[in-house]
Amino acid sequence: MESNKDEAERCISIALKAIQSNQPERALRFLEKAQRLYPTPRVSALIESLNQKPQSTGDHPQPTDTTHTTTKKAGGTETPSANGEAGGGESAKGYTSEQVAAVKRVKQCKDYYEILGVSRSASDEDLKKAYRKLALKFHPDKNHAPGATEAFKAIGTAYAVLSNPEKRKQYDQFGDDKSQAARHGHSHGDFHRGFEADISPEDLFNMFFGGGFPSSNVHVYSNGRMRYTYQQRQDRRDNQGDGGLGVFVQLMPILILILVSALSQLMVSSPPYSLSPRPSVGHIHKRVTDHLNVAYYVADTFSEEYTGSSLKTVERNVEDDYIANLRNNCWKEKQQKEGLLYRARYFGDTDMYHRAQKMGTPSCNRLSEVQASLHG
């Protein structure tokens, strides 16, 4: 995979710097990771070369990220993050100068496209690829640099907004408008910029990668949204005056629309079938379609009301709904499996990789059978 190759190249680059800094153990770790991601003769030769050299290390192995540990000793104090986080969960653990630089880059981004590193014409697949790469890189359990948590939230919010067609359209129109930012109390340096995601960054991460990081104890989504919601409520209170009649006149079109919608719903009859038993509407009698043998459930009077062409129409609708459900479930199964495989490769977890490979996709298998039957 191309993403594996890019990640392997990054690991090789880090390993070469470690060799120059006389850190053979660190170099070996990254070279082995690169070889797992994208095997090449060059990496194999470097690993063999390092294994043949005597390693001048003490009895105790050094932690993985030693770069910033040395810097902190030389400076005598820890450097707080840009958002005032110092000495907490992030800065108490080791991190590298590359991680600090990466967090700084995200903080300097002016819009969501720049955060994800994609163009404004990026497709859904481009957004997914960028999010996968960055989410793993900035997750607080992986990246302990100051500000990494905020960067992780920014990446999640960026993807959640841009992957939603309606939100993306609004963002393209108003996202860079200074007055829009000021109206929501955000500057261009703020990660949220007036747009809120419908899902927390941690939930989004779990959706992509089939579960959170092991032993995760970081609550990523702070009360930022609550503050924003409170501000909206406060704005509404400020805008409420003694013009009650004016408000009623403004709401009248919406009330009429709701009323018309409710009446139309009452006039439209419910489907005469369900794909699973629904005693509440009387759909308890099981039937099977003639073409694909799809099970569906109907009421007592179904056989009397639907015969001939009307029955064929109903069964065609049943099969269409069934195929749509299969497609949806198949997509979810593939996403879960792909996310788990990606995590396993990234962390070099052999057990996780084998578990992901064994994960079944029953909906996809059934969908293939149905499609073969339709075209057969």
Curated annotation (Swiss-Prot):
It is a single-pass membrane protein. It is found in: Endoplasmic reticulum membrane; Nucleus membrane. The modification N-acetylmethionine is found at residue 1. GO terms for cellular component: endoplasmic reticulum; endoplasmic reticulum membrane; nuclear membrane. Coiled coil: none annotated. Residues 45-97 are annotated as: Disordered. The modification Pros-methylhistidine is found at residue 186. Residues 111-175 form the J domain. Its main location: endoplasmic reticulum. Residues 57-84 have a biased composition (Low complexity). Pfam families: DnaJ, DUF1977. The chain crosses the membrane at residues 243-263. Methylated at His-186 by METTL9. One of its GO terms (biological process) is chaperone cofactor-dependent protein refolding. Keywords: Acetylation, Chaperone, Endoplasmic reticulum, Membrane, Methylation, Nucleus, Transmembrane, Transmembrane helix. Belongs to the DnaJ family. DNAJB12/DNAJB14 subfamily. Homodimer and homotetramer. Interacts (via J domain) with HSPA8/Hsc70. Forms a multiprotein complex, at least composed of DNAJB12, DNAJB14, HSPA8/Hsc70 and SGTA; interaction with DNAJB14 and HSPA8/Hsc70 is direct. Acts as a co-chaperone with HSPA8/Hsc70; required to promote protein folding and trafficking, prevent aggregation of client proteins, and promote unfolded proteins to endoplasmic reticulum-associated degradation (ERAD) pathway. Acts by determining HSPA8/Hsc70's ATPase and polypeptide-binding activities. Can also act independently of HSPA8/Hsc70: together with DNAJB14, acts as a chaperone that promotes maturation of potassium channels KCND2 and KCNH2 by stabilizing nascent channel subunits and assembling them into tetramers. This is DnaJ homolog subfamily B member 12.
